[in-house]
Amino acid sequence: AKPRSNWAAAEDDRPLAATGKRQALASSRLFAAWAPSRIISSPWLRCVQTVTPYSVDYGVSVKEKKSLSEAGAQRHPARTARTVASLFDKDSSSLLCTHRPVLPQVMNVLREYLFEGSAEVLPTEDPYLEPGDALVLQVTEGDNPRIVSVERVRAALD
C-alpha cells in the first residue's frame, strides 16, 4: 500500500502502491493453484485491489466484511474472530484478505484449529507477514476441521 505517512485521505481509501499492484497480479496466478471458490476481504480499497485480479480472472465474487478492516477488528474483535472461524465451516478452498494490524486476531483464531502441539507452524510476532506474503493452510475435512500444514508463500514478480 501507499505509505500511511504519504496519505492524507481516509485510511480505507488508501490504495496499493505500484509494487502492490504487481504483487496482486502475480498472486492471482499463485492462488489459482489452490482454486479458492470464495473470497472474503476487508472492504478497504487496498485489500479489494489485492483480491480483484483473482476474482476477475477466475470468476469468484468478493464478499466484503467490515470485520476484516482495521477499524472493524478494533471495534468488534468477536466479529472478526467469527469471520475467520467461518473459513472452517465449509469443505472448500477460501481466500481471505485483511490488514497487518488485524493479523494477531487472525492468528489467535487459527491457533484454535491447529493440532495439539503444532502452534509453532504459525507466525507468532509482528510482522506476521510481509507485504505480498500469504499463508496457505491445508485443513482436514469433516465435522472437526484441523490445520495440518501451514506454508508461507509469495508470488514471484515478473
List each model region and its residues:
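A broad structural signal for short, well-ordered beta-strand segments within beta-sheet-rich domains
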Residues: P36, D91, N144-V148
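A short, acidic, amphipathic alpha-helical segment used as a generic capping/interface helix at domain edges
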Residues: A78-S92
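Active-site lining segments that contact anionic ligands and/or coordinate catalytic metals
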Residues: D91-S93, P131-A134
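Short phosphate-coordinating micro-motif centered on Lys-Gly-acidic
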Residues: D133-N144
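Beta-strand elements within well-structured catalytic alpha/beta cores of enzymes
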Residues: I40, S92-V106
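Active-site-proximal alpha-helix that buttresses catalytic centers in soluble enzyme cores
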Residues: A1-R75, A81-R82, P104, L110, ...
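SAM/dcSAM-binding transferase cores
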Residues: D158
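Extracellular/periplasmic catalytic domains that process cell-envelope and extracellular macromolecules
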Residues: F88-D89, C97, Y128
